Regions:
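Short, flexible loop/turn segments with low-complexity composition
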Residues: 350-356, 591-595, 642-647
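Alpha-helical solenoid repeat scaffolds of the TPR/TPR-like class and their adjacent stem/linker regions
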Residues: 1-12, 20, 24-474
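Alpha-helical architecture
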Residues: 14, 400-401, 510, 569
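C-terminal alpha-helix/helix-terminus motif
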Residues: 26, 179, 635, 639-646
């Protein structure tokens, strides 16, 4: 079956414009899109636009036979072949034309389109990035790049190109919506809120805008304001099931289980097949201890006609309940099914993988090569330590290692404010460093240009950028000396921490690696380029992360303390006293009453940290030993190095 030309697809004429902006518009003039304008090519192009792909291909074959050097004809033949249904053959022909003209941005744009159609989104993004590098004003390519980047959760990349497009079209509402969504995913909360409120002012009855703003407010712990947005949705659309689900989730997170149940039932009475409302009710049943009822609800979701997002959430929930019931083999089967399903959204069909070991290994090596003792000393000579205002207290560690518990305990101290997971260091890596230094090299190489290009003030700007993001995220209390940043895998940024905040404490939480691997695999986590969606990639990423940490410790004079999660559970007062002494703060017994805090954790650990300390999470991996056996050999050296055992 041949694909039809959608209004947002590239025009078959090869102009590089969307169909709706070219021959999809009745007023659009004929164009050869840069081709050698022979009569046969013009005729073939008209046939392409009309959807007569077979006839167009026949003519283009003839042109190529007459002149094999006609690269445009070879390219359009690839387009005709792909539009005619033979996408693989079409891609190969387009690649061949690109090989002949590697700096042709149109050819790269069209190749990216078909790669995206076949699911090779990563390759498509790379082609589009090259297209706009060759032709910076190629806005159609940049639009497509933004779209694909957001589909792949590459929101920093998307934001970078949205900013370029907004400089050309500052009033484009679609771009502002995409910007707001990217800011939401990047946790740039103040800018996100500003964008959504501006959009809502123009379209006050747009339900999707209120839902997204509610999500953003919920993500900052502003539950009452989030609730107001969902209530607005219900005023616009009474009984809106998505709003009722979000309200039910808010109530469950606040441990108001009866109200959560009422809202879920209200929604199901109106839409009995809404998968997420069944999920909300199943969570309530789990909280109430009615496990078999919850499992039955979740099994119905698993087999119902719902999207993958709902099915995956239900499978994780099912696994959690089966784990509580000590039905470990069934639990692992549910978690395994969830991860296998969830991988599909990240799968690059060209490589057949969702996570590239080679690319991630190369990134770790890049950081090691850059952050050396000599280079850090040279860069720090341009940046005196900060002297005023609240400063970051970095809590680093792999996801599910105990960073949330540590932060909750420390933030109960009257001089420490809980900042949660802050995106600032990641944003510096992804785009802010290169933009601030105005260097074409990506991070960290762009930092090397600071002394050469007279950009010494750029380091001050990067530090201010981080503090600005922290303030926008409401992580900073001016009355307190410290604010925490517990973004998972921030240990990758220890070199950047040492450069920008040399006096800031770094608290590294470690836990038995097998417990971390199991806990990551049994929760829906996308940190570390979605490494947690497979046991093999999880183990690989953990080992490589520790190699990077060892490099940082060897190359830098860090203000660094390591805490074992198990020690924190077994001797909380002793470990907290040691940590506070390391930070330079006096002991305060409120650190042991963290579970009484009104502050809500916004991570997968939100239920656990609302309780006093419990030790059931220690050595949980033993229940799943046979399922973890494939990764034990890779992890054994790290396990032993950290003082743990597999015996």
């Amino acid at each position: 079956m041949r694909p039809s030309t959608g209004r947002n697809d590239p025009c078959p004429c090869g102009s590089g414009k969307k169909f709706k902006h070219c021959h999809g518009n009745a007023a659009a003039p004929p164009s050869v899109g840069g081709a050698q304008a022979t009569p046969l090519l013009i005729q073939a192009q008209r046939l392409l636009v009309q959807g007569n792909y077979g006839q167009a291909a026949t003519i283009l074959h003839r042109v190529v036979e007459l002149d094999a050097s006609n690269v445009d004809a070879r390219h359009f033949l690839g387009m005709a072949t792909a539009f005619g249904g033979k996408i693989g053959d079409g891609i190969e022909r387009i690649r061949a034309s690109l090989h002949a003209q590697p700096n042709n941005p149109l050819f790269r744009f069209n190749l990216a389109f078909w790669l995206g159609k076949t699911g090779s989104v990563g390759a498509a993004i790379r082609e589009l990035m090259q297209a706009v590098a060759i032709k910076p004003d190629y806005h159609e390519a940049r639009y497509q790049l933004v779209k694909l980047a957001m589909e792949r959760h590459m929101h920093a990349l998307a934001k970078l190109h949205i900013d370029v497009l907004l400089a050309v079209e500052p009033e484009n509402p679609e771009l502002h919506y995409r910007l707001a969504t990217a800011l939401l995913r990047l946790k740039e909360h103040t800018a996100m809120e500003r964008e959504f409120r501006t959009l809502i002012a123009r379209a006050p009855d747009n339900v999707e805008l209120h839902m997204k703003l509610g999500e953003g407010l919920r993500g900052t712990g502003r539950d009452d304001e989030a609730r107001a947005e969902y209530d607005t949705v219900l005023a616009i659309e009474p009984g809106n099931p998505d709003a009722l689900y979000e309200l039910a989730f808010l109530e469950e997170r606040r441990h108001r289980v009866e109200e959560s149940e009422r809202l879920a039932k209200q929604g199901l009475a109106l839409q009995p097949n809404h998968g997420f409302l069944h999920l909300a009710l199943a969570r309530v049943r789990r909280r109430q201890g009615r496990m078999e009822e919850a499992l039955e609800m979740l099994r119905q979701i698993e087999t119902a006609n719902v999207g993958d997002a709902c099915r995956v959430s239900a499978l994780y929930e099912m696994g959690a309940i089966l784990d509580k019931l000590k039905r470990y083999d069934e639990a692992f089967a549910a978690f395994d099914h969830a991860n296998i399903t969830d991988r599909k959204q990240f799968l690059d069909l060209e490589t057949g993988t969702f996570y590239s070991k080679d690319a991630n290994k190369a990134w770790f090596e890049t950081l090691k090569d850059f952050y050396t003792r000599d280079r850090l000393a040279a860069l720090q000579s341009y940046l005196p330590p900060p002297t005023s205002g609240p400063q970051p207290l970095f809590i680093v560690g792999f996801p599910r290692s105990g960073t949330t518990l540590t932060e909750q305990m420390l933030s109960a101290h009257p001089r420490i404010h809980g900042g949660d997971e802050l995106p600032g260091l990641g944003l510096i890596e992804q785009h802010a460093a290169a933009q601030t230094i105005q260097n074409l090299e990506p991070y960290p190489a762009c930092l090397a240009a600071v002394p050469q290009n007279g950009k010494q003030d750029a380091l001050f700007k990067l530090r201010d950028f981080y503090l600005h993001i922290a303030a926008e995220s409401r992580a900073v209390d001016p009355e307190k000396l410290h604010f925490t940043d517990k973004m998972p895998l921030n240990e990758n940024h220890m070199g950047l921490m040492r450069l920008l905040f040399p006096a800031s404490p770094i608290i590294h939480i470690v836990r038995h690696p097998l417990d971390i691997v199991l806990s990551c695999y049994t929760n829906q986590l996308y940190h570390g380029n979605a490494c947690a969606l497979s046991l093999d990639t999880l183990a690989f990423h953990m080992v490589e992360t520790w190699r990077l940490v060892d490099h940082y410790i060897a190359e830098m004079d860090l203000r660094y303390a390591r805490v074992r999660y198990e020690d924190l559970l077994n001797d909380p007062e002793g470990e907290m006293r040691r940590l506070l002494e390391f930070i330079g703060e006096p002991w305060d017994p409120r650190c042991l009453d963290f579970h009484k805090s009104v502050r809500v954790a916004r991570t997968a650990s939100y239920a656990q940290v609302a309780q006093p300390l419990y030790r059931s999470s220690q050595e949980r991996w033993r229940h799943y030993h046979k399922h973890l056996e494939p990764v034990i050999p890779a992890l054994t050296p790290l396990i032993e190095k950290l003082g743990y055992s597999v015996s």
